[in-house]
């Protein structure tokens, strides 16, 4: 998959470099050493004390937050998959459909998922839907 221009912004840190100089009071002068004003790129700035700053458009910030949220949700689903497997499902895909539905039912009004203990959720799913999992105790008794 080809990375878009905005997804490669960290690789291009040398394009828009600037120096911030204090004029008087809260007024500052921005002098670009390379690159220029862009509504789609990052600006890497340094003040007179050597502090470094990154300034970027709100659109990129929103996309960054969205990527972070998606990665956190993918990580949560992967932990849930691991915990469902540890409960020994008969059919993993069927158990995951139920698990993902349970996960979606926990989604908050703002669209985010709360911090979830996936191990507890997997055990609860096994209790509510025992037909989706092997019954180890029953199998031990039948020997």
Swiss-Prot record:
Q: Which InterPro entries match?
A: UPF0763
Judging by the UniProt lineage, the source's domain of life is Bacteria
User: Pfam families this protein is in?
Assistant: DUF2603
Query: Which protein family is named in the record?
Result: Belongs to the UPF0763 family.
This protein's name: UPF0763 protein HH_0976
Annotated organism of origin: Helicobacter hepaticus (strain ATCC 51449 / 3B1)
């Amino acid at each position: 998959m080809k990375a878009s221009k905005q997804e490669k912004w960290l690789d291009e840190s040398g394009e828009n470099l600037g120096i911030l100089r204090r004029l008087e009071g809260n007024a500052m002068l921005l002098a670009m050493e390379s690159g220029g004003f862009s509504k789609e790129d990052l600006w890497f700035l340094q003040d007179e004390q050597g502090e470094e700053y990154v300034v970027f458009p709100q659109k990129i910030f929103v996309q960054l937050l969205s990527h972070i949220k998606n990665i956190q949700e993918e990580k949560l689903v992967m932990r849930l998959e691991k915990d469902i497997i540890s409960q020994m499902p008969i059919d993993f895909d069927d158990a995951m459909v139920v698990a993902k539905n349970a996960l979606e039912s926990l989604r908050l009004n703002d669209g985010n998922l709360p911090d979830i203990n996936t191990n507890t959720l997997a055990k609860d799913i096994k209790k509510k839907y025992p037909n989706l999992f092997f019954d180890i105790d029953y199998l031990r008794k039948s020997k």
